[in-house]
A protein has these predicted regions:
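Extended ligand-binding regions for polar small-molecule ligands
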Residues: 21-41, 47-48, 76-88, 124-160, ...
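Periplasmic-binding protein-like
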Residues: 62, 121-139, 165-169, 309-316
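Low-complexity, Gly/Ser/Thr/Pro-rich intrinsically disordered linker/tail segments
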Residues: 332-374
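Extracytoplasmic small-molecule ligand-binding "clamshell" domains
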Residues: 26-27, 31-119, 185
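Substrate-binding/active-site groove segments that recognize
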Residues: 212-238, 246-256, 340
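Export/targeting segments at the very N-terminus of extracytoplasmic proteins
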Residues: 37-38, 160-209, 244-247, 262-265, ...
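Catalytic and substrate-binding regions of cell-wall glycan-acting enzymes that process beta-1,4-linked
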Residues: 124-126, 272-346
Length: 374
């Protein structure tokens, strides 16, 4: 038997190595009690098989210490540590997010995962039926890895997310020019029935009008389109740094989000939800709506739902059975919506897009702009 508790530092909390059983063994002992094990697996699956398959499977629950999605990038102390271990094996890491700790143990017991991790410290024992994997993990691990991955995550969360040049939020107030790309906003905002100035306000929030902007997660261009999203929308990845193609992709994506939230009949409110989903993901916003509805709030009013978007950062809420997609850093999403709305209001004095200024011809004044990480 392997006492995993003494290796708890490996993941800052408990990381349990997989056990695949040829016959029924003693029940697993977990912090919440005894887990009845009745699963029979005909064949062991050890390190060589994992490396041959090219995939290491980590099962976990959502949370800031375990695993979460942040603007298209997977994070969490345990996730980052398991990713390093998978890299050392020459494997890709697949994450299987479970509902709760009991599901985690059964994933382990039924050999559906190679590693499991959860945020509650405690004593766990497991049959050592994957000795090669256990030995490899023990050989690979060094106590400094915990500090390393925590520093890596902290750096990602505290540094500015998008490398971009800073441009003024209003290119020429007297001339009625918001940006070099006003004509594109005016053209493609019609497809989604948005005020073009709202799309411009969103663009400034995403990239400060820098067509070469790129985020730490790989989002690109004016409207910060992820490569996978571009594939889904039928826009070539190679064109994401082209202003018009990027804005076309954004308009298509916004259109999809509008259809996703078509149950919100008020257009102003629906736009708030679309903006929030563009930033934080529609699934998380639907989770917040479900919580609001359960608590007697209006799930179609952003002022009600935004409070629950913020609450999805706390275990009481992201572990609630009604929540399907777990932890969310909601403060950034709420701030995102607020900033775009405020900037849109500041653009209201611009009556129409300037007709004589082509996006491919930046003004000389812009050459004085310096490059920053913001």
């Amino acid at each position: 038997m392997l006492n995993v508790n003494k290796y708890a530092a490996l993941v800052a909390v408990v990381l349990l190595l997989v056990s695949c059983f040829e016959k029924k063994q003693e029940p697993l002992v977990a912090p919440w009690g005894v887990i009845d094990d009745t699963v029979t697996v005909a064949e062991d699956f050890d390190l060589h098989d994992i490396q041959t398959s090219g995939e290491l499977i980590m099962a976990t629950v959502t949370g800031p210490e375990t695993y979460y999605d942040y603007h298209g990038k997977s994070l969490g102390t345990q996730y980052l540590l398991c990713q390093r271990f998978a890299d050392s094996l020459g494997c890709r890491l697949r994450v299987d997010v479970c509902r709760d700790s009991i599901e985690l143990v059964h994933k382990l017991d039924s050999c559906e995962a190679d590693l499991i991790a959860w945020p509650t410290p405690g004593h766990i024992e497991a049959d050592r039926s994957k000795p090669d994997l256990v030995a490899e993990l023990k050989s690979w691990y060094h106590p400094s890895f915990i500090d390393d991955v925590k520093k890596e995550e902290t750096a990602l969360l505290t540094t500015k997310k998008v490398r971009r040049r800073i441009f003024a939020p209003m290119l020429d107030a007297k001339g009625g020019i918001i940006s070099h790309y006003d004509q594109y906003f005016m053209t493609y905002s019609r497809d989604i029935r948005w005020d073009w100035r709202l799309m411009a306000a969103q663009c400034y929030q995403e990239s400060t009008f820098d067509p070469k902007a790129v985020s730490f997660a790989g989002a690109k261009g004016l409207m910060q389109i992820m490569p996978g999203t571009a594939d889904h929308l039928g826009v070539a990845r190679s064109k994401l740094y082209e202003p018009e193609a990027n804005i076309v992709a954004a308009a298509k994506y916004i259109g999809e989000l509008q259809r996703t939230f078509s149950d919100i009949r008020d257009q102003y409110e629906r736009t708030n939800f679309v903006l929030a989903s563009y930033n934080g993901g529609a699934h998380h916003i639907r989770d917040a709506m479900a919580l609001a509805k359960r608590d007697g709030k209006n799930p179609h009013r952003w002022s009600d739902v935004s409070a629950y978007v913020l609450k999805l950062a706390t275990p009481k809420y992201y572990n609630d059975p009604i929540v399907k997609y777990g932890y969310m850093r909601g403060s950034e999403t709420v701030d995102y919506v607020n900033r775009i709305r405020q900037r849109h209001a500041s653009y209201q004095g611009v009556k129409s897009a300037h007709m004589g200024f082509h996006p491919s011809q930046p003004r000389k004044a812009d050459q004085r702009k310096k490059k920053y990480d913001i």
